UniProtKB/Swiss-Prot annotation:
ANK repeat feature ranges: 117-146, 220-249, 253-290
Name of the protein this chain belongs to: Ankyrin repeat domain-containing protein OPG015
Record flagged with keyword Iron: no
Key words of the record: ANK repeat, Repeat
The keyword Repeat is assigned to this record: yes
Pfam families: Ank_2, PRANC
UniProt source species: Monkeypox virus
Origin: domain of life: Viruses
Amino acid sequence: MESVDFMAVDEQFHDDLDLWSLSLVDDYKKHGLGVDCYVLEPVVDRKIFDRFLLEPICDPVDVLYDYFRIHRDNIDQYIVDRLFAYITYKDIISALVSKNYMEDIFSIIIKNCNSVQDLLLYYLSNAYVEIDIVDLMVDHGAVIYKIECLNAYFRGICKKESSVVEFILNCGIPDENDVKLDLYKIIQYTRGFLVDEPTVLEIYKLCIPYIEDINQLDAGGRTLLYRAIYAGYIDLVSWLLENGANVNAVMSNGYTCLDVAVDRGSVIARREAHLKILEILLREPLSIDCIKLAILNNTIENHDVIKLCIKYFMMVDYSLCNVYASSLFDYIIDCKQELEYIRQMKIHNTTMYELIYNRDKNKHASHILHRYSKHPVLTQCITKGFKIYTEVTEQVTKALNRRALIDEIINNVSTDDNLLSKLPLEIRDLIVSQAVI
């Protein structure tokens, strides 16, 4: 019987406590106050706190921050856990980025985060990254796995910095799992989110030791070269080609880099850049199959693009341009005539065509043109005035101008009584030519 009385008293006590806590919460609400004010009380009662949580919470990170600030020596983990249920990684990152909080208090918040590692990856993907914030997370247990963190960083659409990539590579450790570097993601978005080309190129140069295969197809079935062409990044395209990118690679959809270069050359936006890229690709050793595929896949009507293709396709096989004969017959004839003329002009046991357009022989073109700058064939090139294969005229003109500058310098030096003027002409020519770019 006595036990029943004690139970009744206990129930009455809890009922009174419930009424009191409810009254307290109501009193707070009447004055427009909420849980954000309650956590400033010297003692935060769990039951009263839970009643406050029946209403939506605004800025839960602020509430948690204030709780830690007031109760840092008397923290109730129950209160912390209940608040964290309302806090997202986005909330924490937003608060971190704002830098409106004391670092020591915010360190406590990060320590109580479910996964500091996931918080780091979220930050890399969803914010403009600052190295000091990354350091703060590392101090609280996050690990910088090189490839995993780079992929998270490239995945985001915020501004990118090569300094962040360098930091990750220098301070990170090898990944525990076999993770592939998703370098393509940095330029896969629409134009508004693309990183500027100089920064992209810097990042690619930093990451090249971690690229297992520069011609590997990414998750979207494209190569890095394909992505760079689509983005219209001239220097990046050239750099990728210099580092082994295969211009004849076929994408998962059956298209090639030449296909996308031809297609992008027809767009209005950044037209000059895309035409320049198209010409860079056309100068590469394209396979017959790649060229035929580009002709088959592209039914463009842009004459600037078509003429550029004809100019270089004619170097491979005249018959490749038969498909364009109806609309650009005269241009094709002009190309053929200029090519035949260039292929007949010989200097130093090689033709002008090989000297200018052959990848192996044109490495020494400037030296040969300088050496034979007074050869009548070079004068013929200037007189002929090629309208399509203008590179011949440009290279020869550059060589002749360089020759004239060197001769002028030698003549000026020879008028003075100095050691250089006493040397044989051939030696003087060699010395001055090394100094003149």
